[in-house]
Amino acid sequence: MTGYSGFEDEILQLLNANRPATLTRRWLDWRYTQLPGVPPPKVFWIRLNDRPAVGMASLIFRRYWVNGEPRDVAVLGDISLKKDLRGLGLGRQLMAFIGRHLNSWPNHSAFVIPTSAAERCLSATGWTTAGRFVPHVFLMDPTDALRRTVRREWLARGIAAVYKRAIATGLRLTGPRRASLQLVDDVDETFDTLWRQFPKRNLILRDMSQETLRWRYIRHPDHRFRAAKLMTEEGLTGYLIFEVGQQDRTCRIHDILVKRPRDLRRMLVLFAQHVQTMGHPSSIRIVLADRHPYGRSLWKSGFVARPAQSVFQVRSAERGFNQQAWHLTAGDKDV
């Protein structure tokens, strides 16, 4: 086991050798950033004799709030093993080794969003599935989908035009009157004010202070994120963090927070109105944990739940930790 400092190049080389996408040192430094007040990252290696490492995994500590109290949760990630050594039990041995270290840190629970292959290995070494991630989709423009089912282009465009007019009318009639949406490229101190006021009892959620949001989104080396702020007579009462894909015409909401449950629909309707004026996105997509409190009311804003696509697992000495209400979004996956 080592830290991150001094092993950056070895980590980057091993990850790039075993993954289809090429990572950069700039991205890696961003990912392994040690935020104020949390322990430094831990890197676990598989080495055969004195040869270069053939496998690894890391624990990067992130601040979460558990039933209203701040906790440093170890997030497992960067699980990598050379292709010709897979299926030999080395991955399971590595997870068991990490598990023994976690057992020696009883104050630090652990969390992971695994691949399907890693999920089986983790389940066999003491990790418990705590929930699933469910995509919710608001279809703004069905043209692409209609082209696959309707043979005539003119007919697909005609049906899509009727659908889009109906959506525009519905959004206009249901739009809130005493609220507005502001789009910004940074997060200011009002985000901290909202975060301090947000009720954190009876749930588990990632720290969403101004400093954490700036690291995760504003300082991201590869993606450009924007924030949409819900403004009322009270000031900032909610926000969402989003990006618009250029390849798949999807607007992805990565994080979302509102002061009160009733503010959720107001913000999403205003945001859908904004996305419709952009012209390019064909859908809005938000991924939430299956027990996320917002998931139960997204349908009121035009979102349709799709089949769950992945799971998240936890490991903790605390009884019932895996059964709590996890307030997770796509933003909990650093990559």
Task: Report each predicted region and the residues it spans.
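Conserved acetyl-CoA binding element of GNAT-fold acetyltransferases
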Residues: 70-83, 248-260
